[in-house]
Amino acid sequence: MLESPHIPVLPSEVISLLQQTKNPNPQWFLDGTAGEGGHSKLILKTFPEAKLILIDRDAVMLERAKKEILKEIGSLDRVHAFQMNFSEVDSELLQEVGCPSLDGALVDLGVSLFHFLHSGRGFTFKNDEPLDMRLEANIGGKTAADVVNYSSVLHLKKVFWEYGEERWALKIANNIVQTRHKKKFGTNTDLVKLVEASIPRKFWPKESHPATRIFQALRIEVNEELVHAEKGIRALAQCLGIGGVLTCISFHSLEDRIVKWTFRDLKDNGPFEILTKKPILPSETEIKENRASRSAKLRGLMKINPIKESRWEK
């Protein structure tokens, strides 16, 4: 199947925030979620003298991003690529590539459209695929099938409620446990059918599939997305140089809540300033051109000089 060209979310808004860096000659940026390389290409074009640390936890996505950058920029000479989680970024990694500190960083917390349409890992409802959902499938770790087949009713209920905000969490969890005694869940289709049967049709959401919240919850659980989001935001904030900017794009309320609260905590307890009093949202035009952007929210944070002159000092 022919893939549609990738369109990065809030592209000009991300660049506008990164351009607020106080370094008049910015040298180092980091894209913590390379994805299809859309934002990375914009960063490299906007800052032609800068180098980019390119990170993605999915080896497939990292290679796709590098390929896209090479195609459009013509070279990977300014790119240092690593397969890892952005929550693992630290001063040692920066030292490894000769980076003293970051002038700007971006994390896009959404899952790539590629994962839903082409990964074959069970993120979608449309194709019959293994119930996997791992973003680091080449490294190992638990799958969505493991969670569904071996978790207790209470744990499943907690996952579905806390990560999916699913009102039918307990009923779905009970039905899963009853069903798996007869046959283990192996594919996404198995789970979709159970969720559809568990929720009365009159309560199905009008604008999304009834299994959307369950699949979101399992994906978050399998990949520990919210844990890594907070840890990663804190890690990248510490890697900023004075005047450096961190930008975060979120796609649902759980992610945005973590970004908002973590930014606020960093501001209250460290040398940071929030650049976005309210999240930046996509325009109506962007939403029409790129439906994937419709729930996106962008927030920005700057590291400031911790030494402030007292107003009483002369």
Swiss-Prot record:
Catalytic activity: cytidine(1402) in 16S rRNA + S-adenosyl-L-methionine = N(4)-methylcytidine(1402) in 16S rRNA + S-adenosyl-L-homocysteine + H(+)
Gene3D superfamilies per UniProt: Putative methyltransferase TM0872, insert domain, Vaccinia Virus protein VP39
Molecular function in Gene Ontology: rRNA (cytosine-N4-)-methyltransferase activity
Keywords noted in UniProt: Cytoplasm, Methyltransferase, rRNA processing, S-adenosyl-L-methionine, Transferase
GO cellular component term, pick one: cytoplasm
Binding residues annotated for S-adenosyl-L-methionine, in chain numbering: G37, G38, H39, D56, F86, D108, H115
Places the protein is found: Cytoplasm
SUPFAM superfamilies to which the protein is assigned, alphabetical: Putative methyltransferase TM0872, insert domain, S-adenosyl-L-methionine-dependent methyltransferases
One GO biological process term: rRNA base methylation
Cited function: Specifically methylates the N4 position of cytidine in position 1402 (C1402) of 16S rRNA.
Protein name in UniProt: Ribosomal RNA small subunit methyltransferase H
Species assigned in the record: Leptospira biflexa serovar Patoc (strain Patoc 1 / ATCC 23582 / Paris)
